[in-house]
Amino acid sequence: MLDRDGFRPNVGIILLNQRNQVFWGKRIRTHSWQFPQGGIDRGETPEQAMFRELHEEVGLQPCHVRVVARTRDWLRYEVPDRYIRRDARGHYKGQKQIWFLLQLVGHDWDLNLRATNHPEFDAWRWNDYWVPLDVVVEFKRGVYEMALTELARFLPRNDQRNRYLRSGMRQREGAPEVSLGTTTQLRTTSLLVHPGMELPPGASFDPDPRTGDGDPGMPGIHKPAG
């Protein structure tokens, strides 16, 4: 379902944990990481589509999250021709999105990447709020910056670090001022490694997705081999 300009209506989801870190998923069988997102079906409202995509991609139910805010207007990005099926070129232009900021009120183990038979992600991790701007695929970077910037003022005030992020001190024409070397190191108590600890379904510890380095001090999360 495209609008007359060739954009598909879509929702994007920024999911926060209790430290105001964001869910970051690795697309299945690729090296590409992104926020959950998906199309709005005919007859759906953006909020209905958001809750459907939240379950399909992350395995969460409405009771697991609190809706904090949403973007006021559609945010658009164009998809380069090389990513568009040949039969859709000339018709499909990209996505127009309403973005939702959610906070997880459940637990990390409520996340399930295998909630459906057509999973979108095969790995996930928590990242600091602005980190995705440096690691998302280039053609989505502009819409990510618009969404993150518009929704940043709604971040729950429960984290000194995120109060600093909300101060608006940014460098080089809108890029994040926070050090991007501080990608989430899984230091939350719910993800520290302890004997007998159960990870979320399909998850284990792995290298930093930005570098592929197996630095044990910078673990990520991924689906185990086999």
From Swiss-Prot:
The record ties this protein, via CDD domains, to: NUDIX_Ap4A_hydrolase_plant_like
* Key word Hydrolase present: yes
Alphabetically sorted, this entry's keywords are: Hydrolase
Quick one: where's region Disordered? 197-226
Q: Indicate the enzyme's highest-level EC class.
A: hydrolase
Report domain Nudix hydrolase positions: 6-149
One Gene Ontology BP term is:
ribose phosphate metabolic process
Q: What's this protein's family per the entry?
A: Belongs to the Nudix hydrolase family. RppH subfamily.
* Protein name in the entry: RNA pyrophosphohydrolase
What gene is it encoded by?
rppH
